[in-house]
Amino acid sequence: MQENNVQILVLDFGSQYTQLIARRLREYGVYTEIVPYFEKLDSIKSKNPKGIILSGGPASVYEKDAYKPDSAIFTLGIPILGICYGMQLIAQHFGGRVIKADAQEFGKAVLEIMESSQDSKDSSCFAFQGASQGIQAPMTLSFDIFSHHKFPQMLTALLDLWEDSVQASHIFLTKQHIAEIRLEVKAALQSSQNIITATDKKDFLGFIGVEKNKIEMLFVASSVFRKGIGKALLKEALERYLKDYPYILVDCNEQNTQGLAFYKSLGFEKVGMSEKDSAGRDFPIVHLKVSKAILKKALERGTSDSVANAFVCESERVFLRPYTQADFAALHKIVSDKETMYAWGQGFSKKQSQEWLDKQLAHYQQYGFGIWAIIEKQSGAIIGNAGLNHTEISLKGKTQKIVEIGYLLHRDFWGKGYGSEVARMCVKYGFETLGLEEVYCLIKEDNTASIKVAKRLEMQKVGEYPKPYKGKKISHLVFRLEKKVWQESKNNATQGFKSCSLFKGIKQDSIVWMSHADKVESIPQGFRELAKSGNTHYCAIADSKRKIYALQFHPEVVHSECGGQMLQNFAVGICGANTCWNMRHFAQNEIEKLRRIVYGGKAHCENPMSFMQIQEAFKHIGKAQTIQRLVEIWEEGARATHKDLSENEIAGMREEIREAILKSKNLLIAQKNEEWLGFIEIEKNEIAMLFVVPKAFRKGVGKALLKEAFMRYLGAFEVIKVNSLEWALGFYQALGFAKTGKKPIPAGSAGAFSPELIPLSIARESLQKSLGLEAQDSNEGVREKVRCAWATDKDEAARKLYEDYHDTEWGEPLHEDKKLFEHLVLEGFQAGLSWITILKKREAFRVAFDDFDPHIVANYDEDKIKELMRNEGIIRNRAKIEAAIINAKAFMAVQREFGSFDKYIWGFVGGKPIINAFESIADLPASTPLSDKIAKDLKKRGFKFVGTTTMYAMMQSIGMVNDHLTSCFKCNSSLGMQCDKILDFSQGTNTKSANLTKNPKNLHSHTANTRIVDSQHTESSDIKGQSHLESSADSGSAVSLRDFKSCEGATRGSYLEGNDRSGVANSLKITKETTSKVLCAVSGGVDSSVVAALLYRAIGENLIPVFVDTGLLRKGEREAVEKIFKENLKVPLITADASELFLSRLKGVLDPEIKRKIIGETFIEVFEKEAKKHNTKGEIKFLAQGTLYPDVIESVSVKGPSKTIKSHHNVGGLPEWMKFELIEPLRELFKDEVRALGRELGMPESMLMRHPFPGPGLAIRIMGEVNKADLDLLREADSIFIDELHKQSYYDKVWQAFCVLLNVRSVGVMGDNRTYDNTICVRAVEAIDGMTATFAHLPHDFLEGVSNRIINEVEGINRVVYDITSKPPGTIEWE
């Protein structure tokens, strides 16, 4: 199991703000932990983090006895980032001066970045504006998220921009139309959460609104039409919101010709048409669609095409571009200025300026480069010249041709760092673009500013040269910079700020939270200033050589976009942290960890090696992350086996490997416990790549990969080939490969950096034998490819169709939405027919149904239906055609709800296929409870022709269930993918399964043979002692039990005990090696329920979950909890009803603290009594509780460790005999992460999103004495409030909501009668973590409705009030 390896370690003393840092980094997939400042160095080293963050709150570095981190952390050689207090600590430790502030101050300030990456563009997209010099100069756009709730004052400005835009582009609209549509746009702006605005720091230039994968709004001010604003907004939306969708949709008015042209220029294609707009107006709407890949390329091309003539290279503030004749006036203004040209001795005349310009234009033609114009981005003005020039010099008596860099700045721009900026760009261009090995710079002896620049670039003085000019020889110093030095320079001076890319992508003038507490007045030696902000003395400093960075930002800044970006830059860009952590990894790891704890340090089984195709990896972790991880596998191996490789060679080979991986089709990845161990790529009959991580060397991984590849691909060829590296010859020759006799392939043939390769080959039978894959009596032979019995036909063409389908599709996991829709439609058409009929007509179906694009199919009209009914190539059944159209609409509705149909349908099996081990067709069921469940849900959503048998067949065809028979060669191959859900049917099947051959109506028929799929999760499947295994599968859990005694026997991927599959059934019997049990108190809340579900997945019936009904629960609480545990979680909950006991002991008690104490003591008493029933032999060894990360770190003191944990998060006060060993599975998680874990475990959203509920229950929501009558009254009122919140969709928008019975009576009027009844207080708050909270600004009409319902429906209440107190000063609960 891949451990949750710490990537970033945050050292802190318990600041709640520091939690945000860990949470934000985990959002980026970077696993982050928080430990106290006083953590021992050995403990820190043992965690082996890739980076450390020193955070903390207001504790001064001067505070007496305050704990400080061990200073030895600065010697570990890993990057360190100090934030707030961490910055002060760093500054003081390295000799800087820190001044103590009189008082803490926090506020917002403008961030001014002093230096940023010279190698990367500004993170904002560039639009272009005309400039006086006749060029296109980029205007820097700022992008912000618009929220009407936060910025209501901006609404009018955006509406005015919209109106300006449509008046210019929608000339067909009348004033009445515009006024009408303006109201609709206003409503959309008020309700949408995904609106991005573009400004030039003064005015709004445009905005875009998206919903899932659809562009709902895109408008640009008429003054900046055709200047790239629309593309810039689209690019920003693609990066923020649309990047996870394969296709992007947009609707455009047919009469908006400018808009249609714009979208079509970006690759959008028409996929449908509506005669009316969404409001029913007679405006035809064109439905457009484009793939993400095409749009991304179009936007990149659009940017580069627009900029191609504008710049050669760029930095944060300027870009360089070739001069044109139109630039003469601007050029002459600079070179004619005597002060600017002091190094030349005089200014240029117009003739000299023209001659110089002609020379550069000629150089562009001759060399492709020369001296270029420096364009300041902000103004668009030419401010000088910079570039490279061919020249000849004599150095140490030897004449040589060189390329020199040079620049000239107008005097108004001296002393502002532009010299270093343009010099760095020229150096980079020379080395990276021109491929030079060295560059020179010739500087006059008295030009001290330029000499400083040369030294900053680490150029070395190599001599002097008298440079001729106008008949004179002017002495110049000669500086040289070698490429090797430039590359190896640790402080990356020539690359600008790349090594310290803390501010990469951060916009200049960003608004950030600042901490004006103790300030750094002077920075230590070796540090430099990175940014300024507000009135802090120093805002950001760094020592890039030691990789130590410090920020004065208040940790609250991590809430912001730029704060998150800085953290990501540090973790990923500087520390090289991987971003593969996710909740699934955590869940799987935690299950294994819990088993080891409970079962005496031993996990119940060693998970086998499994294999997945690269396409599956793309689906799980994304394309970029997959390729990065594969390249890392290659690089680790390369560095271990080729220690003589230079960094330059590694870098070159890395890119070649990346390209090869990108182009690969048949690439398999070996993994064990989610850890990637190696990969193999096959091209026809050739092994193209085979790489293994060093720690897996000589452990059979390479052979296992080759074995898997043989089973899947290579077994079809007579001869298998490979071009081997010299050092790998032994591996291949041991398997029987021999040299072909051909000459070795020279180094550099396959790629610029490819090494020499030796051609090898082997006969199929020989490799089959050496891999241990010889044919056995059990029909495992590869030679003849024994298939499932249904995959044949008397007709040769039909048999070939069946075989191809069986070998390449059937049972293979499918995740592409369009293909899933195809299968859904074809399964419906197949109903009542043989599957071979579908296979023969499939290509015709694809043409007829527009390649099964649901967006197109959903818009089919009567004419299209008639056209399809005339198509002889398909099955002409009107009901099924109409069903396909209906299903397309329902399919898109599912996509909108779940993000993709794939996510919805695979959610039924937790994202992993169910793999069965049937021996004959007679064992196969026609349907299962799971297919029943899917069919029922699809029908509820409006789908047609989705009966349970049809759905079972579809589950098989898309690989949700794998029913390849044990005799089939694909069974071994597929079993390598997952062992999580293999179930044992060897002990018997139900009557329905056993009698399939007697009842042909149950068969999903191909021809005379039967295509039937998926295992049944029923009681008849006899897995003794493991009924919870079926439960796990039924619940759709993404994390299923792996508690198999000999799990490796169930999958061919282990290779620890050969390839014997005879023990599949027996391998699934679990033996209980220990009687240790875990006691868990369940309250019905999110935390304890997740703990119980997680533990049950890990240890099954060794968990004792106890739910105590105190009688203080909300209406229907007990019934809801019991139902969820029984039906959703499949966890056998033990309920102890002690309601009467609790009420009797609370009688007459008024003081809230005494209430709490009584409830706590009574709970312990009941809990103890229930525990004793299950501990007769001392089996209970552990106590599980839902302690979260905030509970752990909030207990840490500034001055040292504290063993106390907040009592309301624990079962405190347990008797001595119950002092079990504590298990806290959630102690590394935050509340939102606990919910994410619950989703992975298949828990229902209704449970996960429940509001917090206090341990003492309703007792502290009744002011005064607690009795049954008041509890019933409060339950009714509270139930009404919660019900209304759900109805109006406010429930999920507030952190917590409830009613309080004040026990304050007041006079009221009901009809003609006066009343004197009780008062209910309604409370709702908004919060992030409950540390602070503000009252929810619920609409008055909503509150009025709640009040009316409570007063009318709850007898005894005649007044309702709303609590508008925030925290602080108040608390969320009343007692």
UniProtKB/Swiss-Prot annotation:
Gene3D superfamilies: 3.30.300.10, 3.40.50.880, 3.40.630.30, HUPs (3.40.50.620), Hypothetical protein, domain 2 (1.10.340.30)
EC number: 6.3.5.2
Molecular-function GO terms, alphabetical: acyltransferase activity, transferring groups other than amino-acyl groups; ATP binding; DNA-3-methyladenine glycosylase activity; GMP synthase activity
Positions with a binding annotation for ATP: S1083, G1084, G1085, V1086, D1087, S1088, S1089
Domain called N-acetyltransferase: residue spans: 141-300, 318-484, 612-765
KW RNA-binding (keyword) present: no
Region (Insert-1): 120-500
InterPro entries referenced in this protein's UniProt entry, alphabetically: Acyl_CoA_acyltransferase (IPR016181), Adenine_glyco (IPR005019), Class_I_gatase-like (IPR029062), DNA_glycosylase (IPR011257), GATASE (IPR017926), GMP_synth_C (IPR001674), GMPS_ATP_PPase_dom (IPR025777), GNAT_dom (IPR000182)
Keywords: ATP-binding, Glutamine amidotransferase, GMP biosynthesis, Ligase, Nucleotide-binding, Purine biosynthesis, Repeat
Active-site residues, Swiss-Prot/TrEMBL: C84, H554, E556
PANTHER family: GMP SYNTHASE [GLUTAMINE-HYDROLYZING], GMP SYNTHASE-RELATED
Function according to Swiss-Prot or TrEMBL: Catalyzes the synthesis of GMP from XMP.
Protein name (Swiss-Prot/TrEMBL): Probable GMP synthase [glutamine-hydrolyzing]
